[in-house]
């Protein structure tokens, strides 16, 4: 009975959520698009001509937002976006116009090599401008286990960013407040010159979800 009440309450909140309604109205696949939009509005992450990699992209709302932002550039002509968006996820994702999608686990060498090649082609052999990651583990409710899973996904994004970002590039990842959060922030500070946390209004009030932003890579000794 309690579970049914919880499900009914969640469904009621979801249906009446203004961001859900906005996403439906504006054609986004998930309300998460507005989390990225709020952060982008504040920090001016997405700029014309950028090459952007979206880790853990499904169902695709972040890729949609990034694509739309690049398409709005005055330099976008003949139906093409001004820049490139490369998305990857273990889960399938319906195509997004102008977005190159790879389905697979980028921890696997073959998939990683494919991702690297697509990024190289998109950037003309250069490094990339922005990595965004909305990856999240399946949470168990066991704090220590969940903290380790969250930190692991952040480490994957950090490693990818270190290897592929331009010196002036940025990394945005989803994280959760709790055990292990301070360690993740410290890792960002070791890797980036500027580090900030963001809690957009589109994040649900009851959620411990937050986003960590790193900008300007530090040189590797």
Swiss-Prot record:
The protein's enzyme class: transferase
Transmembrane segments: none
GO molecular function: rRNA (uridine-2'-O-)-methyltransferase activity
Family annotation (SUPFAM superfamilies): S-adenosyl-L-methionine-dependent methyltransferases (SSF53335)
Keywords: Cytoplasm, Methyltransferase, rRNA processing, S-adenosyl-L-methionine, Transferase
Active site (UniProt): 174
Compartments reported by the entry: Cytoplasm
EC number: 2.1.1.166
List of residues binding S-adenosyl-L-methionine: 60, 62, 89, 105, 134
Pfam families attached to this UniProt entry: FtsJ
GO cellular component: cytoplasm
Major location category of this protein: cytoplasm
Catalysed reactions listed for this entry: uridine(2552) in 23S rRNA + S-adenosyl-L-methionine = 2'-O-methyluridine(2552) in 23S rRNA + S-adenosyl-L-homocysteine + H(+)
Stated family: Belongs to the class I-like SAM-binding methyltransferase superfamily. RNA methyltransferase RlmE family.
Function: Specifically methylates the uridine in position 2552 of 23S rRNA at the 2'-O position of the ribose in the fully assembled 50S ribosomal subunit.
Name under which the protein is recorded: Ribosomal RNA large subunit methyltransferase E
Organism from which the protein derives: Cupriavidus metallidurans (strain ATCC 43123 / DSM 2839 / NBRC 102507 / CH34) (Ralstonia metallidurans)
């Amino acid at each position: 009975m309690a579970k049914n009440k919880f499900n009914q309450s969640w469904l009621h909140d979801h249906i009446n959520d203004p961001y859900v309604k906005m996403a439906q109205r504006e054609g986004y696949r998930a309300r998460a698009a507005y989390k990225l939009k709020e952060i982008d509005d504040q920090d001016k992450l997405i700029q014309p001509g950028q090459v952007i990699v979206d880790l853990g992209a499904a169902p695709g709302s972040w890729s949609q937002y990034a694509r739309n932002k690049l398409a709005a550039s005055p330099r976008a002509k003949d139906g093409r976006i001004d820049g490139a968006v490369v998305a990857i996820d273990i889960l399938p994702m319906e195509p997004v116009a102008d977005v190159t999608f790879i389905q697979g686990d980028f921890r696997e060498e073959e998939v990683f090599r494919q991702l690297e090649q697509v990024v190289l082609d998109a950037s003309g052999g250069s490094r990339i401008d922005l990595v965004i990651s909305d990856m999240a583990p399946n949470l168990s409710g066991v704090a220590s286990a969940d903290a380790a899973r969250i930190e692991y996904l952040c480490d994957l994004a950090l490693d990818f960013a270190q290897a592929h970002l331009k010196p002036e590039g940025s990394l945005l990842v989803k994280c959760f407040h709790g055990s292990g959060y301070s360690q993740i922030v410290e890792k960002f500070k070791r890797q980036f010159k500027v580090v900030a946390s963001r809690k957009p209004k589109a994040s649900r009030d009851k959620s411990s979800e937050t986003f960590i932003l790193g900008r300007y890579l530090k040189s590797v000794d």
